[in-house]
């Protein structure tokens, strides 16, 4: 393999290792901060090197100029970056397969087109970030497009070799990927695609024509995927869909012994408790039975198993436990309290100890499910969400605490110097009212800062990617963290305050830019706090000179100039004008740098 490809993979692994400084008990504060700084500096250097490699070997290449040898080398490289057992870099694997698809189209090579349609669809699917029911699904349409085009070759199925036929069948089955499971109508649409694929997979004609194709495994995988409709059933009682899910669960329960293979797609690690869940939603057993099965599975999990199956057994299983435990009748809850607390502590320790390896996608999905299930449970799990953010990605937690401190600092100064700018916040409609409730407003400002980026816990594989610049497709996904945060915080009862801060913190003051797009204006009851948070967010992100490694920190003076240049458009005039006071600037500078050191030490020492 080209040595540049090997170097890129080595850089990936080194940057992941640098993300976790070698801290230890008794380590001096200055030494720990220096360790974090040095790691960030090395990561930045490696990122620049990796970007240069990618520019040379992928981004500068065009399909019309590729040779067969180069195409073969790129295909091998893509296989090293992504397969079902690991996920070194799904995004670059996708870019390679997209390039190879263009190459195959130019050559009019149908076999290669079908193969690359499959792999482009799969790698983009694993790049995508989705809510549990796929109601948020930014790349879903593109994913389905690849598979639907691949499935369209069924019309010429008999004319292809066995390998290509297998890809066509996989594309047909995968056409249901990325479909929403948010409503009964969504589930019916999913079932229509499911039934069409199963009609081919079960067909005596095709099985007789090509007996060596693993039809039974394909059927098993289809049933395993239909279990994803449990996400819909956790929100809605729907006997019709519940019976369909139970049908698949019973099939899997019967056939599981035949399908114990090293294939992450089959999710064998959780099919045991899927059966209990399906029976519960179909009214065949009490929720207590599901909780018992989950607890038994988690207690058996090896806390030192850091393989994909180990990650899922230790973390993803717990996410389901959060939901079903919350559905227990009140009189049954106390008997589980001690075991649940032990499981929670075990999962946090597991995340802290999880070595940086080639499974960032698996770990990211596990954290996503943990956070999402906690938010969906009818219990106040808000603090737990922060624990998972801390354990999963410490820089995000550092940033959140910094933004919380700075937002409160801005709001406190506005209440003192420009209280009229805070009128309307939290329903306090006069200057006198906002002054009387100043402490309450400051507490809310701090809380909004703490939780503004909670949506990033749904996409830690991107947030923690310091090995190269984000692809356009990945940036589209990252932009959805605001909407994810909004959904999560709405689910735990903060639709009117914290959720609004999460949703609007990247929206411009005048509503003419930023993201998410096409949102109504931020409600007046939270707008002044969101305005302060937006400035705090920009200032912390751009001035971090300790752990920030994807670009160099900017001088505060330059940033203040940028704030002033965008006053009234991106940033609120009332907040920007605070910097017109030299004394405020001096105090802010001290607050910024003292707080940053304190917060870094607090977060990184928690896991020593």
What are these regions (language model features)?
Residues 6-41, 62-84, 109-131, 159-181, ...:
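Amphipathic alpha-helical repeat scaffolds of TPR domains
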Residues 7-39, 335-376, 585-608:
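Intrinsically disordered, glycine/charged-rich C-terminal tails and inter-domain linkers
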Residues 36-56, 83-102, 132-155, 182-207, ...:
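Helix-turn-helix repeat elements of alpha-solenoid scaffolds
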Residues 56-67, 100-114, 149-165, 198-217, ...:
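Flexible helix-coil transition and linker loops at the boundaries of alpha-helical arrays
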Residues 63-66, 85, 135, 306, ...:
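Non-transmembrane, amphipathic alpha-helical segments
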Residues 161-164, 210-216, 423-449, 489-535, ...:
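Histidine/acidic-rich helix-loop-helix segments that form or flank divalent-metal centers
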Residues 346-479:
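Acidic/His-rich, divalent-metal-binding segments that scaffold phosphate/diphosphate chemistry
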Residues 402-411, 477-490, 554-571:
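An active-site-proximal "capping" alpha-helix that borders the catalytic cofactor pocket
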């Amino acid at each position: 393999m080209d040595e540049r490809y090997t170097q890129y993979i080595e850089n990936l692994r080194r940057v992941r290792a640098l993300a976790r400084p070698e801290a230890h008990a008794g380590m001096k504060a200055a030494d720990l901060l220096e360790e974090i700084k040095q790691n960030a500096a090395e990561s930045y250097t490696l990122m620049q090197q990796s970007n240069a490699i990618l520019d040379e070997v992928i981004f500068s290449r065009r399909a019309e100029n590729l040779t067969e040898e180069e195409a073969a080398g790129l295909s091998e490289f893509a296989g090293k970056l992504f397969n079902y057992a690991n996920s070194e870099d799904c995004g670059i694997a996708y870019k390679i397969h997209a390039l190879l698809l263009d190459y195959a189209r130019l050559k009019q090579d149908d076999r290669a087109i079908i193969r690359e349609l499959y792999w482009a669809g799969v790698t983009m699917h694993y790049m995508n970030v989705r809510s549990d029911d796929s109601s948020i699904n930014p790349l879903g349409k593109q994913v389905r497009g690849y598979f639907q085009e691949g499935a369209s070759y069924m019309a010429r199925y008999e004319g292809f070799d066995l390998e290509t036929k297998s890809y066509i069948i996989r594309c047909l089955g995968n056409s249901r990927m990325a479909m929403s499971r948010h409503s009964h109508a969504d589930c019916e649409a999913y079932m229509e695609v499911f039934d069409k694929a199963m009609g081919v997979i079960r067909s005596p004609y095709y099985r007789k024509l090509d007996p060596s194709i693993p039809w039974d495994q394909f059927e098993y995988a289809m049933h395993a995927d239909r279990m994803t409709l449990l996400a819909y059933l956790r929100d809605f009682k729907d006997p019709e869909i519940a019976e369909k899910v139970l049908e698949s669960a019973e099939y899997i329960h019967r056939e599981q012994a035949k399908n114990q293979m090293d294939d992450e797609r089959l999710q064998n690690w959780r099919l045991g408790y899927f059966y209990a869940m399906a029976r519960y939603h179909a009214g065949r057993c009490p929720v207590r039975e599901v909780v018992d099965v989950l607890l038994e599975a988690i207690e058996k999990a090896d806390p030192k198993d850091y393989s994909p199956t180990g990650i899922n057994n230790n973390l993803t299983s717990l996410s389901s436990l959060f939901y079903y435990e919350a559905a227990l009748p009140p009189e049954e809850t106390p008997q589980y309290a001690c075991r649940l607390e032990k499981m929670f502590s075990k999962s946090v320790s597991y995340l802290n100890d999880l070595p940086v390896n080639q499974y960032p996608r698996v770990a990211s999905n596990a954290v996503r499910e943990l956070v999402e299930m906690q938010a969906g449970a009818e219990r106040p799990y808000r603090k737990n969400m922060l624990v998972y953010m801390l354990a999963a990605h410490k820089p995000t937690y550092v940033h959140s605490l910094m933004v919380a401190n700075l937002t409160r600092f801005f709001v406190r100064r506005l209440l003192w110097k420009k209280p009229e700018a805070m009128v309307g916040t939290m329903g306090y409609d006069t200057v006198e009212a906002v002054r009387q409730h100043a402490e309450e407003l400051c507490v809310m400002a701090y809380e909004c800062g703490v939780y503004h980026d909670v949506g990033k816990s749904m996409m830690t594989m991107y947030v923690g990617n310091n090995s190269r610049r984000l692809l356009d497709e990945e940036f589209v996904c990252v932009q959805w963290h605001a909407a994810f945060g909004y959904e999560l915080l709405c689910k735990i009862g903060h639709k009117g305050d914290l959720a609004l801060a999460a949703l609007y913190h990247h929206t411009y003051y005048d509503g003419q830019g930023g993201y998410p797009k096409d949102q109504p204006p931020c409600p007046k009851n939270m707008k002044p706090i969101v305005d302060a948070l937006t400035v705090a967010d920009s200032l912390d992100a751009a001035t971090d000179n300790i752990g920030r490694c994807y670009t160099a920190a900017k001088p505060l003076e330059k940033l203040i100039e940028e704030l002033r240049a965008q006053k009234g458009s991106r940033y609120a005039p009332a907040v920007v004008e605070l910097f017109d006071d030299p004394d405020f600037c001096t105090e802010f500078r001290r607050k910024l740098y003292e707080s940053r050191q304190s917060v870094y030490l607090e977060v990184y020492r928690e896991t020593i």
